[in-house]
Design a protein with these regions (language model features):
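Histidine- and/or cysteine-centered catalytic micro-motif in compact active-site loops
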Residues: 98, 161, 167-172, 179
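Ferredoxin-type iron-sulfur electron-transfer modules in oxidoreductases and energy-metabolism complexes
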Residues: 128-154, 171-276
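Helix N-cap / loop-to-helix initiation motif
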Residues: 1, 162, 234-235
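Generic hydrophobic/packing signal
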Residues: 21-26, 161, 165, 242
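Iron-sulfur-associated redox domains of electron-transfer enzymes in respiratory
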Residues: 1-149, 153
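Short secondary-structure junctions and interdomain/linker hinges
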Residues: 12, 71-74, 159-163, 249, ...
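Cys/His/Pro-rich metal-binding microdomains
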Residues: 65-68, 94, 157-163, 167, ...
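Sequence-level detector for tyrosine residue identity
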Residues: 30, 47-48, 69, 73, ...
């Protein structure tokens, strides 16, 4: 969510100046379903044990288990949780900005220079990467052609919860909630007269493709879309696959640097020359 907020700030829909950001090395979060069923409490001992050992936390969001970017990039203060075996007694705070340093002035504690990006963090990242490959195979999303997309989204009931909870969604008014997206009989009649046919994707497929296109550069694969999907569509895996492809092509990691321009607003000479 912090990375997604940075993406919104780049679109002037937020500001980092008036907020102190405290984040942690993240072990993941439990899905909304567990909160509704009120059984998270019984999972917490296992959660903190896995966190302290730097292991994957069972029963967390699948997106969290597959997440390689669990270290905050833009936090003023980072709380070290992962692989902290003494987590119940003490932890380490990394002060990343002057704002973060000013907050702890006068607070007792041991201060020293240190780097959070340690070998241990790389080992955790390797575990997450391997889990991502495994979960992607289980989701059967290696090759997303139109047939696979149509089959995958055939369960969609059109609730559009995914766009409503998406922290990277930046539209003030969703296109699909406006009259512009609704074509009347005259539109189809005109198209038939001009071309002799009307070829189009179903509204459901069109909606999901447009949503993926809009947020692909800024998607942080948080998994909230899958969390609220009543049809249990693996939206987290689809968004991750789409986002990684676009971000790799654009050499861009969303939420890492507030000063880095969005790919869609950055001109690069001879960009994508191999496919143009």
């Amino acid at each position: 969510e912090l990375r997604a907020f940075v993406e919104l700030a780049k679109r002037t829909q937020g500001s980092l100046e008036s907020i102190l950001f405290i984040s942690s090395t993240c072990g993941g979060v439990y899905p909304l379903e567990m909160a509704v069923e009120r059984n998270i409490g019984e999972q917490l001992p296992k959660y903190w044990k896995a966190i302290g050992q730097g292991d994957l936390v069972p029963n967390t969001r699948l997106a969290c288990q597959a997440c390689e970017y669990f270290m905050p990039y833009t936090a003023d203060i980072t709380v070290s949780l992962l692989s902290n075996k003494g987590i119940q007694e003490e932890t380490t705070l990394f002060l990343n900005t002057e704002k973060g340093e000013s907050i702890v002035e006068g607070i007792s504690g041991k201060f020293s220079e240190g780097d959070l990006n340690t070998t241990t963090m790389e080992q955790i990242r390797s575990k997450r990467k391997a889990e991502k490959e495994k979960l992607s195979d289980e989701a059967e999303l290696r090759n997303l052609g139109i047939d696979e997309i149509t089959k995958t989204f055939s369960r969609c009931i059109g609730c559009r919860n995914c766009s409503k909870v998406c922290p990277a969604c930046y539209c003030h008014m969703c296109f699909f909630e406006t009259e512009t997206s609704e074509h009347g009989p005259l539109y189809y009649e005109t198209e038939l007269e001009k071309t002799g046919c009307v070829s189009m994707l179903s509204d459901t497929i069109f909606y999901h493709l447009v949503r993926l296109f809009h947020v692909s550069t800024s998607c942080t694969a948080c998994g909230q879309c899958a969390d609220v999907c009543p049809a249990n569509i693996p939206l987290w895996a689809i968004s991750l696959k789409m986002g990684e492809a676009v971000q790799k092509a654009s050499d861009y990691l969303p939420g890492k640097d507030i000063e880095e321009g969005l790919p869609i607003t950055t001109f690069v000479p001879e960009e994508f020359a191999e496919i143009v």
